[in-house]
């Protein structure tokens, strides 16, 4: 459904977030409002962005075995991004789906966690996602990753990241 591409369009509780270890499935993309999704060309725009991200994510080496998130009821999280461990604390707002991750290396990310048809999506502004990936993977010279930051500049209100499944 088109609403799968709009953040906050479904009910999502902290208990749902904490229910599983969420493993990388594919690139994720959603818009912050139905209006912005419609302006961008709807699901077609979201699919285009996901296809582009897929190419870059494959080159970067993301897989279900090396990229995952585990959220705990006590407000802590453990994650691996391309095999690099990242852990810390988080807050999650069930109304807005805003998630704030504060981790080691002074890395923090504000984004959104939302339910989709096959699991959840964890999504961020592309430049913030790029910073985390570069810092954790030491791939700052990798031109593939640089493109991730460029992908969304043509779309207002888009967030990118990871679609995750159980």
Please place each PLM-identified region on the residue numbering:
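Lipid interaction determinants
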Residues: 1-74, 78-80, 84-86, 94-166
């Amino acid at each position: 459904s088109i609403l799968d591409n709009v953040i906050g369009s479904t009910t999502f509780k902290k208990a749902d977030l904490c229910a599983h270890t969420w493993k990388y499935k594919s690139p994720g993309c959603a818009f912050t409002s139905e209006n912005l999704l419609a302006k961008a060309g709807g699901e077609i725009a979201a699919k285009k962005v996901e296809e582009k991200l897929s190419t870059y994510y494959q080159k970067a080496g993301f897989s279900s075995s090396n990229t995952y998130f585990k959220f705990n009821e006590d407000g802590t999280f453990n994650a691996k991004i391309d095999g690099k461990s990242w852990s810390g604390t988080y807050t999650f707002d069930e109304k807005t789906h805003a998630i704030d991750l504060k981790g080691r290396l002074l890395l923090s990310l504000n984004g959104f966690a939302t339910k989709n048809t096959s699991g959840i999506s964890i999504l961020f502004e592309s430049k913030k996602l790029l910073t985390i990936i570069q810092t954790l993977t030491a791939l700052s010279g990798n031109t593939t990753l640089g493109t991730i930051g460029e992908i969304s500049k043509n779309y207002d209100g888009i967030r990118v990241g990871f679609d995750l499944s159980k």
